[in-house]
Amino acid sequence: DYREIGRWLGEQLRTKKQKIGVIADWKMSEAVQAEICGLNEALEGSESKISWCIYRRKEQDIVERMKKETKADALVVLDAGILEEFGEQAENGTYEGAELYGVGYSLKTIALLDNGNIQGLAVPDGYEIGYKSVEEITKRIEHRSYKMQGYITEYQVLGKENFSMDEDLERFLYSYE
């Protein structure tokens, strides 16, 4: 449920007054729109506000694009590739900027969270998403009149304060079996 993911990310940011920048994938994606809607809902009534939103375009240099925007205290990155890129820059000491929160799918993003390079991470169950998608496509191919359905899949939420790679990785991976 992408709206819930956005809402969880917003809950992490509403506790103190912050300017928030959002970096997202394709603007017309239903997932991105739902995540941003949930983020806005969670921030409602708080002193934290979204200052700007950048939707990634093909071959666009996000860092250069961000330089044109006002400084943000926190970044919500709804593009897993960009979150991983920024996290790696933080790990290498080349990222100097806002705290990072976002959506990630890889063990690399989880390791970046564990190292403190990412402050909050929502991890959708990519396996279940792919499996259900293929299952629905198969039903549609087999039965032309079948109306494909959407599904709500599970996701894990991890914060740097409550996650330790040593203690939680096995439990985390087991939850996706």
Cite the ranges covered by each PLM segment.
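Hydrophobic alpha-helical
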Residues: 39, 55-112
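Short, solvent-exposed amphipathic alpha-helices that sit
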Residues: 5-9, 30-50, 85
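Short, well-ordered coil/turn elements that cap or connect secondary structure elements
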Residues: 15, 45-47, 95, 115-116
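Hydrophobic alpha-helical segments within soluble ligand-binding/sensing domains
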Residues: 1-21, 105-109, 124-143
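Short, high-confidence coil segments that cap the C-terminus of an alpha-helix
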Residues: 17-18, 70-72, 118
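Rossmann-fold dehydrogenase core element
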Residues: 116-123
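Hinge/cleft segment of the Venus flytrap/periplasmic-binding protein
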Residues: 128-177
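Short beta-strand->loop
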Residues: 21-30
